[in-house]
Amino acid sequence: MTLQDMQIRLKQAFPDAEIEVIDLTGTQDHWEVFVSSTLFTGRSRIEQHQMVNRAFAEELRTGEVHALSIKTLIRKE
């Protein structure tokens, strides 16, 4: 996935989010994502990370995304 693909996917899953995506190795398969969204309100950190992982479930399954480091924050309205 490209950087733009990652950003689009996150925006689709979290329309209100502030997002930052970093390609950790330059190989487009090791990523770090920062997502701040109101959709995380009332959810545990594990649930927040599961939500982000679901956005990339197929790519993680096939190995297109090999590593995904996730940082989440509950965004205030």
Language model feature labels by segment:
Residues M1-E18:
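N-proximal, solvent-exposed amphipathic alpha-helical segments enriched in charged/polar residues
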Residues F14, H30-W31, F40, F56:
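Aromatic side chains
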Residues F34-S36:
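Short hydrophobic/aromatic beta-strand micro-patches
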Residues T41-E77:
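C-terminal structural segments of small proteins and small subunits
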Residues M1-L3, Q28-H30, A67-S69:
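Charged, low-complexity, helix/coiled-coil-prone segments
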Residues D16-E32:
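Short edge beta-strands and adjacent turn/loop segments
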